Every structure is written in structure tokens, then in C-alpha cells.
Curated annotation (Swiss-Prot):
Record-given protein name: Peptide methionine sulfoxide reductase MsrB
Cross-referenced InterPro entries: Met_Sox_Rdtase_MsrB, Met_Sox_Rdtase_MsrB_dom, Mss4-like_sf
Catalytic activity: L-methionyl-[protein] + [thioredoxin]-disulfide + H2O = L-methionyl-(R)-S-oxide-[protein] + [thioredoxin]-dithiol
Lineage: Bacteria, Pseudomonadati, Pseudomonadota, Gammaproteobacteria, Cellvibrionales
Alphabetized UniProt keyword annotations: Metal-binding, Oxidoreductase, Zinc
Cellular component terms (Gene Ontology): cytoplasm
Cofactor, free-text remark: Binds 1 zinc ion per subunit. The zinc ion is important for the structural integrity of the protein.
Length: 134
């Protein structure tokens, strides 16, 4: 992880709007079917909202019916970190940006082939870099 993991709340509040801060830095969750990228089919690369690290390719995005953008694998194996999450009386696996620690969402073992995984990601935690844009 980079030095971004050591930044304080004030640093992130200056960079993110209130909803993005709640989700990315306080491990919040956006309401299902409300996120900007829930239904997006635009080609490109999804970057971390906090640090612009590439996380997911649109080619791995699919409609899981969950109400959140879902991907079957990250752009590379070490793009995201996984942390055991026992909040809210459940046992889940939290997904974070490996570069800055941004809360992205959770990963579940009910996704499609080839991985069988569903990375259920908050739209507020990512931003789409459209294909051909830099």
C-alpha cells in the first residue's frame, strides 16, 4: 500500500463529497439500484475514486441483479485487498483498494465463470475512465 493509507480524514474530506467520504472512508454502502454505474455498459477501466488506481475492466462487469456494479475479477490480482468483515451480524469479505485502502464493497462466492466470484462494488468508490480517454 502507498502513503495514501496514512492520510487523515481531513485530507479525504477535501477530495471527496459527503456521500463518497461516507462510503469510501467510513465503509458505508449506497442504496441498491441508485449508483451511477449500476447499469453502465460503457467500455473502459474502473478506477479507485480516491487514488485513481485501476481496479476493474468493463469486460468483467455483469448484471448480477443485486443493484450494485458487479465484476467477476479485478484488473490484476493485487489491485484489491480482502479483509474479513464481521459487521452487521454477518461474515463477509470486504474489498478495498490495495493502493489507498478505500472501501469498495464486498466479494461473494456466487459469481459467474470463470472465477465464480462477484465483486459487489459501490459506484461512489469507483470512477469510469472511458475507453480511449486518458
Amino acid at each position: 500500500m502507498s502513503d495514501l493509507t496514512k492520510k487523515d480524514d481531513e485530507y479525504w474530506r477535501d477530495k471527496l463529497d459527503a456521500e463518497q467520504f461516507r462510503i469510501c472512508r467510513e465503509k458505508g454502502t449506497e442504496r441498491p439500484f441508485t449508483g451511477e454505474y449500476c447499469d453502465s455498459k460503457e467500455p473502459g477501466t474502473y478506477l479507485c475514486r480516491c487514488c485513481a488506481e485501476p481496479l476493474f475492466e468493463s469486460a468483467t462487469k455483469y448484471d448480477s441483479g443485486s443493484g450494485w456494479p458487479s465484476f467477476f475479477q479485478p484488473i490484476k490480482g493485487d489491485a484489491v485487498g480482502e479483509i474479513k468483515d464481521t459487521s452487521h451480524g454477518m461474515v463477509r469479505v470486504e474489498v478495498v483498494c490495495h493502493n489507498c485502502g478505500c472501501h469498495l464493497g464486498h466479494v461473494f462466492p456466487d459469481g459467474p465463470k470463470p472465477t465464480g466470484l462477484r465483486y459487489c462494488i459501490n459506484s461512489a468508490s469507483i470512477q469510469l475512465q472511458k475507453e480511449g480517454a486518458e
